[in-house]
Design a protein with these regions (language model features):
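Ser/Thr/Pro-rich low-complexity tracts
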Residues: 1-174
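Short, surface-exposed charged micro-motifs
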Residues: 45, 130, 211, 282, ...
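Hydrophobic residues embedded in beta-strands of well-ordered beta-sheets
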Residues: 54, 139, 220, 289-291, ...
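Zymogen propeptides
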Residues: 169-275
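Active-site-proximal beta-strand/loop segments in catalytic clefts of secreted hydrolases
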Residues: 215, 246-251, 295, 354-357, ...
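Short, solvent-exposed aromatic-acidic interface loops
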Residues: 226-231, 297-301, 355-360
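Active-site-adjacent helix-turn-beta-strand microarchitecture at beta-sheet edges
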Residues: 250-333
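Conserved, well-ordered active-site substructure
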Residues: 256-277, 285, 326-382, 386, ...
Length: 426
């Protein structure tokens, strides 16, 4: 005959009237109908049996905190007793109300038996949330910063944890919020030109960002510069042009060479078979109005565009605030690199962005989808990627290079790389 059943553990380690108790152990046999669970000697039928685990509904019991002995019998063969305790105040979550899955928002955890003020704590996975309002049936909390799509929310009262309810984060909104609310250092360079810089956390990584907003005007002219005779530093090209500020422009490897037009004259016709990753976008300046255009036909298509100044680059990032489907088959898009981008707002303002990278712990850089989301968060409707990596540079007259170019491997302003072209404000 089979030896007497043995109880190894009870889950949970308390008895909640009406709740389910899982009894783990051995020698339970295979017939659930033959099993009874005894609470202080009172027998109740097992509801499930799965190998070493028996499930039973806990009966209404005694007072909260009173100990109770649990045994299991199989065909009259009774186990040794295991001690548990009645808990009538176990918190239970019935739902989570409000919020859009964004950090710092208030959401209400609804349920039962949350106790009086200060008795319960709310956890999003292992992170305790700040409670702003509480009652026996509702706990209003601030959504904590966790970089995950989904977490489990539980309420703990008197050392006992409730059931878990899933909560979803909208990470795109969270990242936008982190970018918008970062501690930006802001300086007006002149009427209609504002420079902002910040160290922040976005996309679950440290970021170093510089942004310039430009309202085009008689005073604020947008131009493209191209060093046809060979590569030159952004600072040299912009300084020689008498610019107020500028960023590095297009790629300059032979097979990525962009079409460039300046003052109505073609200064570089560009490589014919440039891939769309590096050539499906163009900045087009016409009568000092800037457009960011998608050019599926790359350089060949760009040659047909009307404009005073035109520069081809890629990939195209953002159209009417919608992030482009960017190919994931190239690390150019999927890896976090230093980046330079240019975009326009619905009002025709121009946004330049540099994102530093390749400095672990200080500046991680971004993928191109992240760069597109950053440009959208900063207010761009349409945007494109410019050359990045060691080329990423923002130069401002009287200040010099203000971002942290990585070409010298040092987190300073000295690592500028010679580049083929620039976009600048005069």
């Amino acid at each position: 005959s089979m030896p007497a059943p043995v109880i190894v553990s009870l889950v949970p380690d308390y008895l909640q009237p009406g709740g389910t108790l899982m009894v783990y152990g051995k020698n339970f046999g295979s017939d659930a109908g033959a099993i009874r669970v005894l609470f202080d000697g009172r027998e109740y039928p097992a509801e499930s049996l799965s190998g070493n685990r028996v499930g039973v509904t806990v009966p209404d019991g005694g007072q909260d905190g009173r100990p109770v002995s649990v045994r299991l019998s199989r065909d009259g063969n009774v186990s040794e007793a295991v001690s548990s305790v009645w808990r009538t105040d176990v918190p239970e979550i019935t739902g989570i109300d409000g919020g859009r899955g964004v950090y710092g928002e208030l959401v209400t955890v609804a349920g039962k038996r949350f106790g009086t003020a200060g008795e319960s704590a709310v956890y999003f996975d292992e992170t305790e949330a700040e409670i702003t309002k509480e009652s026996e049936t509702a706990l209003t909390v601030k959504v904590p910063r966790i970089y995950k799509e989904d977490v489990s929310v539980t309420v703990v009262r008197g050392g006992v944890r409730s059931n878990a309810v899933s909560f979803s984060y909208d990470l795109d909104r969270c990242d936008s919020l982190l970018i918008v609310t970062a501690g930006w250092k802001t300086e007006q360079l002149r009427e209609g030109v504002v420079w902002k810089s910040a160290f922040l956390k976005a996309f679950d990584t440290p970021q170093s960002m510089n942004v310039v907003y430009v309202t085009p005007s008689q005073q604020n002219r947008l131009r493209i510069g191209c060093s046809v005779s060979g590569v030159r530093r952004t600072s040299s090209q912009c300084g020689d042009a008498g610019a107020l500020l500028g960023v590095n422009g297009g790629y300059f490897d032979e097979k990525k060479k962009p079409f460039v037009k300046i003052d109505g004259t073609v200064v570089q016709s560009g490589y014919d078979r440039v891939s769309s990753t590096f050539g499906n976008a163009a900045i087009v300046i016409r009568n000092n109005r800037v457009e960011i255009r998608k050019v599926a036909g790359c350089n060949a298509e760009a040659r047909t565009l009307e404009g005073d100044d035109i520069l081809v680059c890629g990939p195209f990032l953002l159209k009417d605030g919608v992030v482009e489907q960017l190919s994931t088959s190239t690390t150019h898009n999927t890896a976090m690199h230093p980046r330079t981008a240019v975009g326009v707002t619905g009002d025709g303002d121009v946004i330049f962005l540099t994102v530093d990278g390749r400095f672990p712990g200080k500046a991680a850089g971004m993928t191109t989808p992240q760069l597109a989301k950053a440009m959208r968060a900063l207010g761009a409707d349409d945007a494109m990627n410019l050359d990045g990596g060691g080329s990423t540079t923002l130069w401002i007259s009287g200040k010099g290079v203000v971002n942290y170019p990585c070409d010298n491997g040092a987190f300073d302003h000295g690592g500028e790389r010679p580049v083929g072209s620039v976009v600048y404000v005069k």
